[in-house]
């Protein structure tokens, strides 16, 4: 694992990413322009305390991601503190946006490397954090579907009927990712398939890098999965993180007085929305969520209503979170200067 794999976003890339983010935001505002009067009217109904409650729930997501990072990294660095875990969470959120979705892990690896964790194990642990997240998304959506599939079947028409197909596709991808981490058989299959890459110097170098990453991933997964109590803590934190995120649309709907949808119905719809968004392309976390949200909730809310809820939901779960992560990222850099790298356990 090379030093280049762990890096901070450059100032030039950050500026370019912010300009892209601004352009995407302008596109969304333009798409919503025909319903802007309804959106502003719905937002104007909110009290200060309601807005603060929604924003607080939105900020719980990156904070809980930091808690997950803390629990995972302590399997390697017992002296790794909760504050450092929160730093890693903020670095991931900030890096994901300013590198247009490509740099969350490299930014986190830079921090972890400075904190004393080797690049290989660090990459393995951050990959496993992602796998735990995807697995929890799959389990959460599956439980919600099992408990409420009759209600969903009775209240969906048109394009929503394709949800089971989208669910199956994403589920297969997530299961394959999990097996790649935990199954020696699948790992050996992956090594065998890598042997069919072109015999050029460029592709053989990539093959060597991927084989090294696969070896590290297998080692770290065996080490982490052997610690069952730690895995249960990780799943519990991941589930709590998703629960808070899925509460956001319900709070938005209730505070705006828009729909009689029940709490658990909104939990189901939001879990499906996040699930479907995994199958859609995105830039810096934008595009896929908006499309999936309009698709799923559009069957239960009027067009102006669903856009109003989406606007508040994205302000709380994306824009405010990104602004907070920018502050958190620069605080994390100050922490790096102060810390003495601990030894791996």
Q: Residue ranges of each PLM-predicted region?
A:
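A short amphipathic helical element positioned immediately N-terminal to and/or at the very start
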Residues: 37-45, 213-226
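Hydrophobic alpha-helical transmembrane segments
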Residues: 51-55, 82, 86, 123, ...
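Membrane-interface helix starts
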Residues: 13-16, 45-53, 222-236
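Transmembrane helix-loop-helix hairpins in multi-pass inner-membrane proteins
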Residues: 1-41, 92-204, 282, 286-345
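Membrane-embedded helical hairpins/re-entrant loop segments and their flanking transmembrane helices
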Residues: 64-94, 252-269
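Transmembrane helical segments that form the transport core of multi-pass membrane transport proteins
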Residues: 221-272, 280
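Membrane-water interface at transmembrane helix exits
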Residues: 29, 40, 69, 73-77, ...
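Membrane-helix interface segments
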Residues: 10-11, 47-49, 78-87, 118-119, ...
């Amino acid at each position: 694992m090379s030093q280049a794999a762990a890096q901070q976003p450059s100032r030039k890339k950050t500026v370019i990413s912010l300009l892209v983010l601004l352009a995407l935001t302008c596109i969304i505002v333009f798409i919503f322009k025909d319903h802007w009067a309804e959106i502003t009217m719905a937002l104007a109904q909110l009290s200060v305390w309601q807005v603060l409650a929604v924003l607080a729930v939105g900020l719980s997501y990156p904070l809980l991601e930091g808690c997950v990072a803390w629990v995972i990294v302590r399997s390697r660095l017992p002296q790794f503190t909760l504050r450092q875990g929160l730093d890693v969470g903020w670095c991931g959120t900030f890096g994901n946006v300013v590198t247009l979705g490509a740099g969350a892990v490299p930014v986190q690896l830079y921090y972890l490397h400075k904190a004393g964790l080797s690049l290989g194990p660090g990459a393995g642990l951050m990959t496993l954090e992602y796998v735990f997240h995807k697995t929890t998304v799959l389990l959460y959506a599956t439980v919600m579907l099992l408990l409420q599939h009759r209600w969903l079947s009775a209240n969906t028409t048109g394009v929503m009927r394709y949800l089971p197909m989208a669910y199956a596709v994403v589920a297969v991808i997530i299961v394959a990712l999990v097996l790649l981490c935990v199954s020696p058989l699948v790992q050996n299959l992956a090594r065998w398939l890598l042997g069919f890459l072109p015999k050029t110097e460029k592709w053989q170098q990539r093959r060597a890098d991927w084989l090294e990453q696969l070896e590290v991933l297998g080692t770290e997964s065996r080490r982490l999965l052997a610690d069952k109590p730690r895995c249960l803590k990780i799943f519990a934190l991941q589930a709590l993180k998703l629960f808070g995120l899925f509460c956001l649309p319900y709070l938005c709907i209730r505070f705006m007085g828009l729909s009689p949808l029940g709490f658990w119905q909104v939990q189901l719809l939001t879990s499906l929305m996040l699930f479907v968004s995994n199958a859609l392309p995105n830039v810096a976390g934008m595009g896929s969520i908006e499309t999936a949200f309009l698709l799923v909730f559009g069957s239960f809310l009027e067009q102006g209503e669903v856009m109003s809820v989406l606007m508040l939901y994205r302000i709380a779960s994306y824009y405010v979170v990104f602004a907070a992560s920018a502050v958190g990222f620069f605080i994390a850099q100050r922490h790096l200067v102060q810390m003495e790298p601990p030894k791996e356990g």
